[in-house]
Amino acid sequence: MLLNERIESAFRDVSALGSHVFVFILIVFAYLIGLKLLSLQLLVAVVLSYFIIMIIRTFYFRNRPVKEKFNSFFSKIDSSSFPSAHSSRGIIILILLSKYFNNLYLTLFLSFCTLVLIYSRLRLKKHFFSDILAGAILGVVISLFVLRVVQ
């Protein structure tokens, strides 16, 4: 395998940290080890993010940098680039876990992971910078809202 292929593969792996599956596993894991408040905050934030992004993508479709084909309403929404759901979920995880654990080293580690995740979406040509920025802003707003409401 060529070096460039390995790098691309690594970025695809990192990008999975913002996927629905990873976040669902994180929520279930937090619940199972007794972190029920964190689990609930993550669940509310991710569901809220999902619905807001779905509404935005329903009314404002933007092709990804590498255009994807779609043949149904849901695949069209998934093919839309704006805003980045991965960025939104990455920021949500960063803020909620950092606030819950209040640990500088964990916050620095999560910040690094989130930056790499965000960069991976650009590198893999899944989003434009403005998609990433909008997703990140949405993640911040939702996280702050959830921290205020879900206590």
Short names for language-model regions:
Residues 15, 37-45, 106-109, 130-134:
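Alpha-helical transmembrane segments of integral membrane proteins
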Residues 1-25, 37, 53-79:
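N-terminal transmembrane-helix/juxtamembrane module of multi-pass inner/ER membrane proteins
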Residues 2, 6, 29-36, 100, ...:
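Structural signal for the C-terminal ends of transmembrane alpha-helices
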Residues 45-57, 114-121:
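Alpha-helical transmembrane segments of multi-pass membrane proteins
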Residues 28-52:
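Interfacial segments of alpha-helical transmembrane regions
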Residues 24, 42, 46-50, 132, ...:
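Alpha-helical transmembrane spans of integral membrane proteins, capturing the lipid-embedded, hydrophobic core
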Residues 30, 48, 52, 56, ...:
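Alpha-helical membrane-inserting segments
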Residues 70-151:
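Membrane-embedded catalytic cores of phosphoryl/pyrophosphoryl-handling enzymes
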